[in-house]
Amino acid sequence: MCSSDLPYRYTEGGSISTPFYCHLCDIMAKFAELLGLQDDVDHFLFCKRFATNAYNAMFFDVATANYENGSVTANLLPLAFGMIPEEWEGDVFANILNMTENRFGGHVSTGVVGIQQLMRTLTDRGRADLALKFATDDTYPSWGYMVRNGATTIWELWNGNTADPSMNSGNHVMLLGDLILWEYEYLGGIRALEPGYSKILIKPTFIDGLDTVRCAYESVSGRIESNWRRDGDMMIGEILIPANTTAEVWLPGDDEVRKFGSGRHTLFTRVR
């Protein structure tokens, strides 16, 4: 989100609303499955398929592998929400990277809507390095740029200190996007496998240039920790698993899942 008259920075409303409708259909189908309502599961999945087919017919350009005007948000949302035919996913993601790294110089290239899915989608598709650059950058546009220019909360606009007309809000937390989720779920790798964190997944992402991660989460089951440091070609981890819970640990480079009970555990893995 910025104050700009550049058309490639904007995404048409229709190409935003439908992906979120499809995302909500997925969520409702999961709710229905938990309740044992198979007819409702089938209904919501049908609604998603119907909307997805119409959306792709309306907005997807086969010649360029772009949605709508090719903005990062226009391509990112259908990719994040599983709406793109599998054979086109790689080309659409390549367009996201091309726009981000070339036109935007490796900077954040979405507004308040797209930023909700940006960090996780990049990491899921093998570009955690780019997500880390976004998280640590302090040049415009970035979260670090806000901090460097005196912000103590998240601005409404990436260019909030220079926008004309000026921004309305200097406390616009939604522009933080999925940054904090990404830090906990991807850098620390802490996720719930079962409700209430009675069963925990620890699946950290190791990124070149990031040598130390310390992550703790106060879950309803107790404190969970996932701490990692690099030592040469080894990653050394210390995890804390709450009482009466279990954890599965998936580490890059490991061929199998490690399973742990309650307590503090030290782990070693070689970084390939």
Indicate residue ranges for each PLM-predicted region:
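Short, small-residue-biased leader/transition segments that mark boundaries at the very start
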Residues: 1-3
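Surface-exposed helix-capping loop/turn segments at secondary-structure junctions
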Residues: 30-40, 57-65
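Mature, folded catalytic cores of secreted/periplasmic enzymes
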Residues: 23, 43, 50, 54, ...
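Well-ordered alpha-helical scaffold segments within catalytic/enzyme domains
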Residues: 20-38, 76-86, 116-126, 182-189, ...
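Conserved structured core elements
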Residues: 15-25, 38, 42-45, 49, ...
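Non-catalytic C-terminal accessory modules of carbohydrate-active enzymes
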Residues: 32, 45-46, 129-272
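Long, well-ordered core segments of solenoidal/helical folds
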Residues: 45-64, 85-105, 127-146
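Solvent-exposed loop and edge beta-strand segments that line ligand/cofactor-binding
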Residues: 5-20, 57-75, 81, 99-115, ...
